[in-house]
Amino acid sequence: MLECYQYKKGGINSINMKKKVIVQLRNFEKKDALVLSERIYQELTTAQIEDMICLWNTKQHDGKYFEMFAIVASGKVVGRLSLYSYKDKTISIGPEIFPEYRGKCFAKAAMIKAIGIAKEKGYSMISQQIRVDNEASIALHTSLGFEMVGIPFVNSKGNNVCMYEKSLR
């Protein structure tokens, strides 16, 4: 059983999913351009999104390992998840679930799969920046064994964030 967290105004509700939550992580394909256009990249043309998908599928960004996955449940793309190597043996995992699919344990199931991929690729640490006001993400990461390290700071995007880390050893 997965324990998941659903954000509600005024706090986080813990929900237990009695049924197994099955998600697939797969690389984005050109056919996913419409979903990405509707959900995230309204300002881009289909051709621009297809070009971006091709770049993602090179599995590199700035000379480092990077992979963008579609999170798929019951045949529908319900979100996306990125893996990015930013230090030797340290990786960042960035999940995003589309609003209408939140609270259904898709983020937790996808994170569990992504942690497995990171281990398979030989990473020993996951390090995340999480906005201090993102209660759902903090609850998700804490439930997966991440711990806050250091003190809150303002990142390069101007957001107040904390670092959360998890050892893979």
Q: PLM features: residue spans?
A:
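Conserved GNAT acetyl-CoA-binding A-motif
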Residues: 120-129
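Active-site acidic-Proline motif in GNAT/NAT acetyltransferases
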Residues: 98-100, 104, 132-133
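Conserved N-terminal entry element of GNAT/NAT acetyltransferase domains
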Residues: 1-34, 38-39, 166-169
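Acetyl-CoA-dependent GNAT
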Residues: 42-92, 98-100, 168
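Conserved catalytic-core motifs of GNAT/GCN5-like acyltransferases
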Residues: 129-130, 145-163
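Conserved acetyl-CoA-binding loop-helix of GNAT-fold acetyltransferases
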Residues: 103-116, 139-143
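Hydrophobic adenine-recognition pocket in adenosine-nucleotide-binding enzymes
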Residues: 28, 97, 130
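Long, contiguous binding/interaction regions
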Residues: 83-85, 140, 161
